[in-house]
Amino acid sequence: MEAQTKVIIIDYGSQVTQLIARRVREAGVYSEIHPCIVTADQVRAMKPAAVILSGGPASVGEADAPTLEKGLLELGVPVLAICYGMQLLGHNLGGQLATSETREYGPADLTLLGDCPLWDGIDKSATTRVWMSHGDKVKTPPPGFAVVGRTATLDVAAMADDARRIYAVQFHPEVHHTEEGTRIINNFLFHVAKLKADWTMSSFVERAIKEMAETVGDRHVVCALSGGIDSTVVAVLLHKAIGKRLHCIFVDNGVLRLNEGQEVVDYLREHFDLNLKYVQAQRRFLDKLEGVEDPEQKRKIIGYTFIEVFDEEAKALGHVDFLAQGTLYPDVIESVSHKGPSAVIKSHHNVGGLPEKMNLKLIEPLRELFKDEVRKVAGELGLPDFIIWRHPFPGPGLAIRVIGEITEERLDILRKADKIVQAELMSSGWYRKVWQGFAVLLPLKTVGVMGDGRTYEHVIALRIVDSVDAMTADWARLPSELLERISSRIINEVKGVNRVVYDISSKPPSTIEWE
């Protein structure tokens, strides 16, 4: 198979480095992010077609600031430096830096200068809006560089060395706020680097199936199915590669949504002929959760119990060599961050403890992909919309949406309320417009009036948010008529609820889930 065209992105700690990778991939070119400690020899061995230097929060003059190995600029491939990357490049090649009197954050109007290929197709007679986020700046470009962009406060907002195909911009072309950002990145990829747009999900599927078949050979793989898109795509890809030597296990932990377990199992068995075991372990999980109110304790109990159950079921299969997981590219990036993983806000429920416990080799077919790419792969595989566009659902399930103690009665109330939320979002056309929507059962009761009588019953909170990647989120501005209909149905149809409230908190400072 012909080698994949590849762009290497060097990460200097910007919060939006992943956006660079996504913009490149959206253009049909494969990209990888590597920490700034990577060496020029390591990058050379990756055979990149181009290199992009990301932004970052540091100042080039700081003692512990990330550095740039000069060899990265001598690979003979085009280079695009962004923000901190531009300052680092300017410093290394003999330019002069200065500290801005005030840090510049937000929009700026860029004047395009000269005949720079980055500006191809952009109207040069007017300014274009870009997004800035910097403290330092390049005061004098290095030898061989021409100034190709300026703003009212920045004489060197962009510079270019056409002979060496090295370009630098002080703004962030990867963010949506930069009006011509996508065009600028595409101009770098196709007009400067002259790359091929050969990264497609159909080519990924073909390659993934071939590689998994070669890796597994005649051995067996076990896969934990949750019914979510990631594990389902992993299972279907593996099934195409190795057939019945894939063993899927779906564990019902007792905190799934209404009828969810049986519906998922029935669909996957019927449409994909998966070798699938449905383990009904509800009682085992709920007994361990009895009386537990602390959310972190709930997560740990569910995680540890899942590992116990899954381990028992996998051992019962006999000899299995591989464990399949739905690891995505953001997980991989986080694990090799230039500063190490970020602070843990909540423990993540996954099967991370299984490979060591079971002595299995990991197989992670989606580790190159972002979430939106997984959805495209699902489409290539013929998965239905209800799986492709299913809202994210936490591993601990409803256990962290029942605030406080978990009981059968409280789970029943939440399941019925959540079913109404999902149904109304779908029937109104809002389900695919929002990132996530669900109900939360609060640990309190309030006074109400129904008919001629006083009530003292439970409160349901609605959490419906807009997001791109769950890193940040904002509450969804749903029509008041839709919110009214959801509230009315829950109060009238779910016994034990007399009040519905709408969560209008953003992330940050709040998280999407309540626990």
Swiss-Prot record:
Single annotated GO MF: ATP binding
Domain GMPS ATP-PPase: 199-390
Quaternary structure and interacting proteins, as annotated: Homodimer.
Annotated function: Catalyzes the synthesis of GMP from XMP.
Annotated positions binding ATP: S226, G227, G228, I229, D230, S231, T232
Keywords (A to Z) from UniProt: ATP-binding, Glutamine amidotransferase, GMP biosynthesis, Ligase, Nucleotide-binding, Purine biosynthesis
Full protein name: GMP synthase [glutamine-hydrolyzing]
Active site: C83 (nucleophile), H172, E174
Cellular component per GO, a single term: cytosol
InterPro entries the record matches: Class_I_gatase-like, GATASE, GMP_synth_C, GMP_synth_GATase, GMP_synthase, GMPS_ATP_PPase_dom, NAD/GMP_synthase, Rossmann-like_a/b/a_fold
Keyword Nucleotide-binding among UniProt keywords: yes
Catalytic activity: XMP + L-glutamine + ATP + H2O = GMP + L-glutamate + AMP + diphosphate + 2 H(+)
Metabolic or biological pathway, per its Swiss-Prot or TrEMBL entry: Purine metabolism; GMP biosynthesis; GMP from XMP (L-Gln route): step 1/1
EC number: 6.3.5.2
Cited Pfam families: GATase (PF00117), GMP_synt_C (PF00958), NAD_synthase (PF02540)
Domain Glutamine amidotransferase type-1: 6-198
